[in-house]
From Swiss-Prot:
It catalyses: alpha-D-glucose 1-phosphate + ATP + H(+) = ADP-alpha-D-glucose + diphosphate. The lineage of its organism: Bacteria, Pseudomonadati, Pseudomonadota, Gammaproteobacteria, Alteromonadales. Belongs to the bacterial/plant glucose-1-phosphate adenylyltransferase family. This is Glucose-1-phosphate adenylyltransferase. It comes from Shewanella baltica (strain OS155 / ATCC BAA-1091). Pathway: Glycan biosynthesis; glycogen biosynthesis. InterPro entries: ADP-Glc_PPase, ADP_Glu_pyroP_CS, GlgC_bac, GlmU/GlgC-like_hexapep, NTP_transferase_dom, Nucleotide-diphossugar_trans, Trimer_LpxA-like_sf. CDD domains: ADP_Glucose_PP, LbH_G1P_AT_C.
Length: 420
């Protein structure tokens, strides 16, 4: 099946800016050495691959990736996996690190991150600027957002989705809209969100994806830069300041294809990160990584196929209901309902269940592991038991999440740190 995507005048006139500088502090030690957008997901990808793939699949070929916090692995990944675009054809994916272009400060907020790159955006001469969050895993055709923005005559359009009020409280920007989806009110991360029309248990939450007419965006950023009391944030400052006098609309998040449920996940906690990976193991997952109509692009390492060795009664190498990536060796061990990233080795007589195992992990013999996240490069000592007794896990120095997922990192195992 062909997966060629075609550009339109709207996408051709659009420059996308992905904000990828966040740490993701609720992921604790998992982001000690990498920015959240550089975090692994789905067996072989990183979170940044999803908004980037959405851009390419939507026909948007000019993209800037804004980086700040511990960005080395993110920059390296984007350069390796996304450097094949042809500038002479108007295609590019560029890295935009914090570089104190307009002041001695680093990026102070989401709006400031865009403001400090105005000269780079202006050089591209876009009619529209799309500002995207690099923190979420989702599949979205931005062409629909562009079409709705142009048709409505909006100055700014905010992508939104309905989420439970309890989930949105303190975590999402929440908006009020009229019957035409014009935004009438906006609060950034309220503790008591206002509910959606006709649905007292749900609210309309911002996805952190914004579309602007370029000159309108520049005008608002310049005004905000002169406001000494501003937090330099789109949700806290820019949107509340413009909704009364300008055309600001909401765009409901939709699937990239008709008759399919839209997929969006906030993987900002250990539990949500673990759960989103576990969902991929379903026979018909909400996010189908095997859909050729909407491929997820990434850096393709040259690795040998996964291998499963030994077939004795007491030592059988096998994986059931799992994702096992390139370079993995399951040597006389059992893996069930788990996601194994590249070059993981599970040695004889070990059992790994319901776990997310990041690249380069080695599980030595006679280990028992369940409901765990093993960070990149961990070497699990022979005979270690993880996830069966939370008190014992904590005594070993591991972190146990609210819902009982155990995080293990190299530092917790006394190994040299710095894996990204």
């Amino acid at each position: 099946m062909s997966n060629v995507r075609y550009t339109s005048n709207l996408t051709r006139e659009t420059y996308a800016l992905i904000l990828a500088g966040g740490r993701g502090s609720r992921l604790h030690e998992l982001t000690d050495w990498r920015a959240k957008p550089a975090l692994y997901f789905g067996g072989k990808f990183r979170i940044i691959d999803f908004p980037l793939s959405n851009c390419i699949n939507s026909g948007i070929r000019r993209v800037g990736v804004v980086t700040q916090y511990k960005s080395h692995s993110l920059i390296r990944h984007v350069m390796r996996g996304w450097g094949h675009f042809k500038k002479e054809l108007g295609e590019s994916v560029e890295i935009l690190p914090a570089s104190q272009r307009y002041s001695e400060n680093w990026y102070q907020g989401t709006a400031d991150a865009v403001f400090q790159n105005i000269d780079i955006i202006r050089h591209e001469l876009p009619k529209y600027v799309m500002v995207l969050s690099g923190d979420h895993v989702y599949r979205m055709d931005y062409a629909g957002l562009l079409a709705a923005h142009a048709e409505s005559g909006a100055d700014m359009t905010v992508s939104c989705l309905e989420v439970p009020i309890a989930e949105a409280a303190g975590s999402f920007g929440v908006m009020e809209v009229d019957e035409e989806m014009r935004i009438l009110g906006f609060e950034e991360k309220p503790q008591q969100p206002k509910h959606s029309p006709g649905n007292p248990e749900m609210c309309l939450a911002s996805m952190g994806n914004y579309l602007f007419n370029t000159e309108f965006l520049f005008d608002q950023l310049k005004k905000d830069a002169l406001n000494e009391s501003s937090d330099r944030d789109f949700g806290k400052d820019i949107i509340p300041a413009i909704i009364e006098k300008h055309n600001v609309f909401a765009y409901p998040f939709k699937s990239a294809f008709p008759n399919e449920q839209a997929y969006w996940r906030d993987v900002g906690t250990l539990d949500s990160f673990w759960q989103a990976n576990m969902e991929l193991l379903s026979p018909t997952p909400a996010l189908n990584l095997y859909d050729a109509k909407w491929p997820i692009w990434t850096f393709q390492e040259q690795l040998p196929p996964a291998k499963f060795v030994f077939d004795d009664d007491d030592r059988r190498g096998m994986a059931l209901d799992s994702i096992v990536s390139g370079g993995c060796i399951i040597s006389g061990a059992t893996v069930r309902r788990s996601v194994l990233f590249n070059e993981v080795r599970v040695c004889s007589y070990s059992l790994v269940e319901d776990s997310v195992v990041l690249p380069d992990v080695v599980v030595l013999r006679h280990c028992k592991i369940k409901n765990a996240i093993l960070d990149r490069g961990c070497i699990i000592p022979e005979g270690m038991v993880i996830g069966y007794n939370h008190d014992h896990d904590r005594a070993k120095g591991f972190r146990v999440s609210e819902k009982g997922v155990t995080l293990v990192t190299r530092d917790m195992l006394g190994l040299p740190v710095g894996y990204e």
